[in-house]
UniProtKB/Swiss-Prot annotation:
Function, in words: Component of the ubiquinol-cytochrome c reductase complex (complex III or cytochrome b-c1 complex) that is part of the mitochondrial respiratory chain. The b-c1 complex mediates electron transfer from ubiquinol to cytochrome c. Contributes to the generation of a proton gradient across the mitochondrial membrane that is then used for ATP synthesis.
Protein's cellular compartments: Mitochondrion inner membrane
GO MF entries: metal ion binding; ubiquinol-cytochrome-c reductase activity
GO cellular component term of the entry, any: respiratory chain complex III
Residues given in the record as heme b b566 binding sites: 97, 196
Protein name: Cytochrome b
Binding site for heme b b562: 83, 182
Gene3D superfamilies given in the database record: Cytochrome Bc1 Complex, Chain C
Upper lineage: Eukaryota, Metazoa, Chordata, Craniata, Vertebrata
Residues of the signal peptide: none
Self-association state and partner proteins as the record states: The cytochrome bc1 complex contains 11 subunits: 3 respiratory subunits (MT-CYB, CYC1 and UQCRFS1), 2 core proteins (UQCRC1 and UQCRC2) and 6 low-molecular weight proteins (UQCRH/QCR6, UQCRB/QCR7, UQCRQ/QCR8, UQCR10/QCR9, UQCR11/QCR10 and a cleavage product of UQCRFS1). This cytochrome bc1 complex then forms a dimer.
Species the sequence originates in: Sylvilagus aquaticus
Transport recorded as keyword: yes
Additional detail: Heme 1 (or BL or b562) is low-potential and absorbs at about 562 nm, and heme 2 (or BH or b566) is high-potential and absorbs at about 566 nm.
Length: 379
């Protein structure tokens, strides 16, 4: 008698995705981030659902409803901080996942990669809209500044911004629609994740060497289910350490002041996970140029597969590219630091240099390094 998991129409899908899936035998811990992102998404949807039960999306009561959640709801403080810091863990895993893709050449799976870029944009949009909801000072001014960037679009910009706001400033209409979108987007993300996995399972996983591993595959269960479970434990431990010991470590003190349209905070800055893009935006003195650079800082990921000039897929055996990739990581950390600093010298110059370096590494230096390494191979 054949096993029910191999014959049942629904269980068959689960079986082919999580149990009998042929997986390369040498994938490292860098391949754990996909499943960790799945866990983050589940945590965010569940905590978000419980927060939505007590939250009110009205400018007069939004701030006090969040206070009410933290003070009066059973374990409301825990749910709220799990959700807020869960977002930080989500982005840590996202950036690691994308970095892994760049380092090991996973971007050659074009469909998977492009769906991944769409997912990244969707998660960033969701995080931004969720950031506005508690209606504190930085939440409000962050929303005002970032949505206002769209006014840089020629001809239709101002109309577009007022259309998004639902008025002439960030107000009740904006808050209500942001709450609606923030609620629906995670489910769209979950659907996109399914498509992402569908395309991945068409080709199978890449591995650190970048060499096809068809001759050496092992079943996903039990080998990688247990490995993922270890990753889950590590992630949950980190998240709980953050939530239970310093829940406000990554937040902004300004957000404990209710939103006031008449009082601008001295330094407007987004959450830490957007600081690198914010630094790139600020390093260009022209508004439209800054907005284009901001969009390109993420959209550049779509160009990476076109610039893959190396004869090898992974960077595992390419020392020059390896150095460049780690310089890119250092550069992104520098940009993140600069994004949180006030706009004055020397930070302006450092930000501009780091921004130029960011685009140079991806567009010029990495393809050049690949060509040099190809030459070295011939010698």
């Amino acid at each position: 008698m054949t096993n029910i998991r191999k014959t049942h129409p629904l269980l068959k899908i689960v079986n082919h995705s999580l149990i009998d899936l042929p997986t390369p035998s040498n994938i490292s811990a860098w391949w754990n981030f996909g499943s960790l992102l799945g866990l983050c998404l589940i945590i965010q949807i569940l905590t978000g659902l419980f927060l939505a039960m007590h939250y009110t999306s009205d400018t007069l009561t939004a701030f006090s409803s969040v206070t009410h959640i933290c003070r009066d709801v059973n374990y409301g403080w825990l749910i709220r901080y799990l959700h807020a810091n869960g977002a930080s863990m989500f982005f840590i895993c996202l950036y690691m996942h994308v970095g892994r893709g760049i380092y090991y050449g996973s971007y050659t799976y074009l469909e998977t990669w492009n769906i991944g870029i769409i997912l990244l944009f969707a998660v960033m949009a969701t995080a931004f809209m969720g950031y506005v909801l508690p209606w504190g000072q930085m939440f409000f001014w962050g929303a005002t500044v970032i949505t206002n960037l769209l006014s840089a679009i020629p001809y239709i910009g101002t109309t577009l911004v007022e259309w998004i706001w639902g008025g002439f400033s960030v107000d009740k209409a904006t808050l209500t629609r942001f709450f609606a979108f923030h609620f629906i987007l995670p489910f769209i993300i979950a659907a996109l994740v399914m498509v992402h996995l569908l395309f991945l399972h068409e080709t199978g996983s890449n591995n650190p060497s970048g060499i096809p591993s068809d001759s050496d595959k092992i079943p996903f269960h039990p080998y990688y289910t247990i490995k993922d479970a270890l990753g889950f434990l590590a992630l949950i431990l980190l998240l709980l350490l953050l939530v239970l010991f310093s829940p406000d470590l990554l937040g902004d003190p300004d957000n404990y002041t209710p939103a006031n349209p008449l009082n601008t905070p001295p330094h407007i800055k987004p959450e830490w996970y957007f600081l690198f893009a914010y630094a790139i935006l600020r390093s260009i003195p022209n508004k439209l140029g800054g907005v284009l650079a901001l969009v390109m800082s993420i959209l550049i990921l779509a160009i990476i597969p076109l610039l893959h000039x190396s004869k090898q897929r992974s960077m595992m055996f390419r020392p020059i590219s390896q150095v460049l990739x780690w310089v890119l990581v250092a550069d992104l950390l520098t940009l993140t630091w600069i994004g949180g600093q006030p706009v004055e010298x020397p930070f302006i110059t450092i930000g501009q240099v780091a921004s130029i370096l960011y685009f140079s590494i991806i567009l010029i230096l990495m393809p050049l390094a690949s060509l040099i390494e190809n030459k070295i191979l011939k010698w």
